[in-house]
């Protein structure tokens, strides 16, 4: 920074200075200049070998307009006062010295004498001295390049040709030091040579591309045209990476502009190497030539020697591969000090400096040094320097700073400097705000930490509370006393507990280890519930909760019997498959109750993350074990019953395949060492009884299905639904609606009507909803009737209701909520009949059990299976056009049929042609008929291998113009040879046929064993007809057919066009 105390450096000594307390301010002021004076002293220390003093020739063309005739103010208002410049007159110097002495007079006599001696040694007017006496503890910074450099220079006013040095990122401003690093060997040698030849001046110009790193200008467009005329004050050997480099400290004096670029010579390197030896021998010689710079040698006796011309820059640098430029000075435009715009902008800059100084200590020191360095006491006298200082301390964009440098109009320069300074203020304020917030947070946390530790210590001293970590360790150890941990688990627990004891509560791993120890000590190691092997008790519980379900109940009783013989019950994996609403989930609870096991249920429907089954790694934030470990923690036994619901709806995503994770869990050979990712220790879940539920087994992966024992639960027939409604659903619904002891009942006919017209599905879920709706409406009517009676009595007695305040109403409501339930009067007797269902439930949902009471030719009822249960499905076939001898045969299929059913229709069509030509050779129906086959309810997709005989019968019925009995249904797949294949879901299809009012059902003979296993109440009212070939089907459904008539049915119609016959469903 610029300083007025450049006449003598502040010396350092080993002696301790005892400054008076009241003069600490002066000591701080002196210390603030120590760094600047050290740079000056070190940079000019090597110049002490010579007493050469150069006359200072200050530019005369930059004077303010109002100072034109003032002989005392001949210096440039912008760049004439450098860091080393002294006051211009002895009178001013003396006044400054006296003032400064007066300020330091009270500190100590010794300091005052030393300062006076230093001031007395200053040189006379227009001379400036770079540094004072040598100090032993201050080493020169420029090493070996300091022996023959002149100590004092007179800065030349005109220096037309210079070494051009490109500067990156930000420009230099007159009056402010800047250290640069040169990596180019030629440039480094040229700088050294300039110092040796006592011409340490260069031109510094800003590169336009801030990412460019070069020391030589090859094109004038690389740099901005306006730069600074700078003096090399000192040089240092440096190292940039693996290459040697040179650091040079520059002091800019004034602005210059490039007029011409002289690019480096290609053959300069060889010439430079040839002159290296010569330059070494002339280190102490004073070369002279007809150069632009002249110097006066000043001997120790004070006599001046004649000026000697110094070698010109081109001749010095002609052997170096460097860039030279011809330049011209860029003077400031004349300005008026009293210009209101300049004064206003200067004042605003000072205000901004004050604001920055309030938030940035670094800026505060720089501003203080700058204010002291001013030659005039008033900053308004030097606005140009103020603008340069504002730009020099701002971290603005290089283009904005270059604009400040190029501005010659002082007002314009001040405004541009104010702009970049305002940006610096915003940056400083933001940084100050961030630092303040961070300090507040750190202070608050530190305060909380100290208070917390003090509170812990106080409580520990009072014996009121143990340390939280010690309390946790004690709790963990206490839990393990009642557990029978396996050896490998005990080892893991001890290791984790030991690590936990050495962790600090503020450590990141503290909570992770604590949670892990909490989980490992809350698992039921060695705890088992006592199982009940009483068959009668198990049968009683199962019958109490569910009607029917003989297969499930028999399997549970078998499990109890085996457990009783062995003395223990091993875990099993069962899968209950059936349509919704048949009681799969509720039967799992009954099994747990019958076996005296704890029950836990979780659903895997739509599950896509394998971590839900096997847990997360402990390295994740918020990690936790999987569902199995959570179940064991909740039930606190090793042998619960875990129900895995909706196992057929497991999803799959990029997070893994949960179905594959279940393979290890649901395998009795592997689940004795089930590994949860969070626990990371083998868990024995072989004693767990796993019960899975599904609507279909088609979507269960085969490897998973193979590990489970599948038990099918078919839909309920009407008789079963009636018993379930009377024994289970109605009592539950009455209790839920407050009618448990009321005389409100639903007749058997109403229940049957409810099943037939409102709850036609395979399960009983809709039946339960309908019954609950009936009792809710009944409860409403009873309560309303009671309230109406009470109101009528009050009116008859003349008692009117009292008005109550909101508070009393609220109290009454609370009292009513906590009062005893309302008892239904004994006189209430409601019997709900079938005719009342419309009143409670609205119009019937299912108006008819089947579409056709009398089926026309071509219409046959088939039976299908869905995950929702069995369904009845009609197959309709008609002739599209009038049958004629010119017709082309075809078959069109509709009804959203799947690929399997489309193939079945093709097989049936081909088989029907073959069968008709074999048994009725004169019937040419299929040779001329354009047919359309349809399965009603086209919005529902249909597929499956069991509609072959139904489609073939529909085609033959149309070809023979003979209807099939309306009460006959059939199911079975057909081959081209007429063989009928085995089908699945016979129970569900039988239930669907019975619900549709069928009397006869045809099924494959290979399913005869399935038919015989059906309960009698399912087969009641149905005649089962097993068939092995289609001939058996044809004989059964067309038993009364006239073969001769059917054989000759169509030829007469085809020959006679006047008697064309059109087939229609009403025929």
Curated annotation (Swiss-Prot):
All residue ranges annotated as the Lon N-terminal domain in the record: 162-425
Single GO molecular function: ATP-dependent peptidase activity
Keyword rRNA-binding: no
Catalytic activity from the UniProt record: Hydrolysis of proteins in presence of ATP
Domain Lon proteolytic: 854-1040
Subcellular location: Mitochondrion matrix
Active site: 946, 989
Composition-biased stretches (Basic and acidic residues): 55-82, 293-311
GO CC terms, sorted: mitochondrial matrix; mitochondrion
Region described as Disordered: 55-142, 262-314, 791-820
Regions of compositional bias (Acidic residues) in chain numbering: 128-139
Transit peptide, UniProt annotation: 1-36
An annotated GO BP: mitochondrial protein quality control
EC id: 3.4.21.53
SMART domains: AAA, LON
Quaternary structure, from the entry: Homohexamer or homoheptamer. Organized in a ring with a central cavity.
Similarity section: Belongs to the peptidase S16 family.
Function: ATP-dependent serine protease that mediates the selective degradation of misfolded, unassembled or oxidatively damaged polypeptides as well as certain short-lived regulatory proteins in the mitochondrial matrix. May also have a chaperone function in the assembly of inner membrane protein complexes. Participates in the regulation of mitochondrial gene expression and in the maintenance of the integrity of the mitochondrial genome. Binds to mitochondrial DNA in a site-specific manner.
Database matches in PANTHER family: LON PROTEASE, LON PROTEASE HOMOLOG, MITOCHONDRIAL
Protein name, entry field: Lon protease homolog, mitochondrial
Gene: pim1
């Amino acid at each position: 920074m610029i300083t007025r105390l450049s006449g003598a450096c502040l010396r350092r000594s080993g002696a301790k200075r005892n400054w008076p307390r009241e003069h600490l301010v002066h000591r701080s002021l002196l210390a603030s200049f120590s760094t600047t004076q050290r740079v000056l002293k070190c940079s000019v220390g090597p110049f002490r070998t010579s007493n050469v003093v150069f006359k200072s020739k200050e530019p005369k063309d930059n004077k303010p307009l109002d100072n034109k005739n003032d002989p005392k103010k001949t210096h440039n208002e912008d760049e004439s006062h450098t860091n080393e410049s002294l006051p211009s007159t002895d009178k001013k110097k003396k006044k400054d010295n006296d003032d400064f002495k007066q300020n330091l007079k009270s500190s100590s006599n010794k300091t005052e004498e030393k300062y006076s001696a230093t001031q007395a040694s200053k040189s006379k007017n227009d001379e400036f001295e770079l540094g004072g006496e040598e100090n032993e503890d201050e080493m020169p910074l420029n090493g070996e390049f300091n022996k023959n450099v002149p100590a004092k220079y007179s800065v030349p006013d005109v220096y037309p040709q210079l070494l051009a040095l490109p500067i990156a990122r930000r420009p230099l401003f007159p009056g402010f030091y800047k250290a640069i690093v040169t990596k180019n060997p030629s440039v480094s040698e040229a700088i050294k040579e300039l110092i040796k030849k006592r011409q340490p001046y260069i031109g510094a110009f800003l590169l336009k591309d801030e990412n460019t790193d070069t020391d030589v200008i090859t094109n004038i467009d690389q740099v901005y045209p306006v730069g600074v005329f700078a003096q090399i004050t000192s040089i240092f050997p440096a190292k940039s990476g693996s290459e040697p480099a040179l650091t040079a400290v520059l002091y800019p004096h004034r602005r210059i502009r490039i007029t011409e670029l002289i690019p480096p010579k290609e053959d300069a390197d060889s010439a430079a190497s040839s002159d290296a030896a010569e330059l070494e021998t002339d280190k102490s010689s004073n070369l002279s030539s007809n150069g632009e710079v002249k110097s006066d040698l000043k001997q120790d006796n004070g006599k001046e020697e004649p000026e000697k011309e110094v070698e010109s820059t081109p001749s010095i640098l002609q052997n170096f591969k460097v860039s030279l430029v011809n330049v011209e000075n860029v003077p400031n435009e004349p300005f008026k000090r009293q210009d209101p715009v300049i004064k206003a902008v200067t004042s605003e800059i000072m205000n901004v400096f004050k604001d920055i100084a309030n938030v940035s200590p670094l800026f505060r020191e720089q501003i203080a040094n700058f204010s002291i360095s001013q030659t005039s006491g008033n900053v308004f006298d030097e606005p140009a320097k103020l603008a340069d200082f504002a730009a020099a301390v701002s971290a603005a964009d290089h283009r904005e700073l270059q604009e400040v440098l190029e501005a010659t109009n002082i007002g314009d320069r001040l405004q541009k400097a104010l702009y970049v300074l305002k940006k610096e203020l915003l940056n400083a304020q933001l940084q100050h705000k961030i630092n303040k917030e961070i300090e507040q947070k750190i202070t608050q946390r530190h305060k909380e930490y100290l208070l917390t530790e003090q509170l812990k210590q106080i409580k520990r001293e009072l014996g009121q509370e143990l340390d939280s970590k010690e309390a946790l360790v004690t709790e963990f150890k206490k839990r393990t006393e009642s557990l029978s941990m396996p050896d490998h688990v005990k080892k893991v627990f001890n290791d984790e507990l030991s690590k936990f004891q050495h962790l600090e509560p503020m450590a990141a791993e503290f909570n992770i280890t604590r949670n892990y120890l909490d989980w490992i000590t809350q698992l039921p190691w060695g705890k088992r519930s006592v199982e009940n092997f009483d068959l009668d008790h198990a049968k009683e519980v199962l019958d109490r909760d569910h009607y029917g379900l003989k297969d499930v109940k028999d399997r549970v009783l078998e499990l109890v019997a085996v457990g009783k013989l062995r003395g223990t019950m091993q875990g099993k994996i069962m899968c209950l498959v059936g349509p919704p609403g048949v009681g799969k989930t509720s039967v799992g609870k009954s099994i747990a109750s019958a076996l005296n096991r704890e029950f836990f249920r979780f659903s895997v429907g739509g599950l896509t993350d394998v971590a839900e089954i096997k847990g997360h790694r402990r390295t994740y934030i918020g990690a936790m074990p999987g569902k199995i470990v959570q179940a064991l923690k909740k039930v606190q036994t090793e042998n619960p019953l875990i129900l895995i619901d909706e196992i057929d709806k497991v999803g799959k995503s990029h997070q893994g395949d949960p179905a594959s994770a279940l393979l290890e869990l649901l395998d009795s050979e592997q689940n004795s060492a089930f590994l949860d990712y969070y626990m990371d220790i083998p868990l024995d879940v072989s004693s767990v009884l796993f019960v899975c539920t599904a609507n279909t087994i088609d979507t269960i992966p085969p490897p998973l299905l193979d590990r489970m024992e599948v038990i099918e639960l078919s839909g309920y027939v009407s008789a079963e639904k009636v018993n379930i409604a009377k024994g289970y659903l109605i009592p539950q619904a009455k209790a839920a609606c407050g009618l448990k002891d009321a005389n409100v009942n639903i007749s058997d006919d109403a229940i049957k009507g409810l099943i037939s017209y409102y709850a036609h599905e395979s399960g009983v879920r809709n039946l339960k909803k309908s019954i609950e709706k009936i009792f809710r409406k009944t409860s409403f009517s009873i309560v309303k009737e009671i309230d109406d009676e009470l109101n009528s009595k009050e009116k008859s007695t003349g008692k009117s209701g009292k008005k109550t305040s909101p508070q009393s109403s609220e109290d009454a409501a609370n009292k009513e909520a906590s009062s005893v339930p309302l008892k239904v009067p004994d006189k209430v007797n409601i019997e709900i009949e079938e005719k009342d269902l419309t009143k409670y439930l609205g119009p019937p949902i299912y108006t008819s059990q089947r579409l056709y009471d009398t089926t026309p030719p071509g219409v046959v009822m088939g039976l299908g299976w869905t995950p929702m249960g069995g369904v009845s499905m009609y197959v309709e076939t008609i002739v599209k056009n009038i049958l004629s001898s010119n017709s082309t045969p075809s078959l069109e299929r509709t009804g959203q049929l799947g690929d399997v059913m489309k193939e079945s229709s093709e097989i049936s069509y081909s088989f029907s042609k073959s069968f008709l030509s074999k048994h009725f050779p004169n019937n040419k129906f299929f040779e001329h008929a354009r047919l359309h086959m349809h399965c009603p309810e086209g919005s529902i997709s249909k597929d499956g291998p069991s509609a072959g005989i139904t489609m073939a019968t529909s085609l033959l019925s149309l070809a023979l113009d003979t209807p099939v009995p309306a009460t006959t249904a059939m199911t079975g797949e057909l081959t081209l040879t007429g063989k009928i294949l085995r089908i699945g879901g016979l129970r569900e299809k039988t239930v669907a046929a019975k619900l549709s009012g069928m009397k006869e059902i045809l099924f494959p003979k290979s399913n005869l064993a399935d038919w015989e296993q059906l309960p009698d109440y399912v087969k009641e009212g149905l005649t089962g007809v097993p068939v092995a070939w289609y001939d058996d089907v044809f004989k059964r459904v067309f038993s009364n057919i006239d073969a001769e008539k059917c054989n000759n049915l169509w030829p007469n119609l085809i020959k006679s066009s006047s008697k064309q016959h059109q087939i229609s469903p009403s025929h």
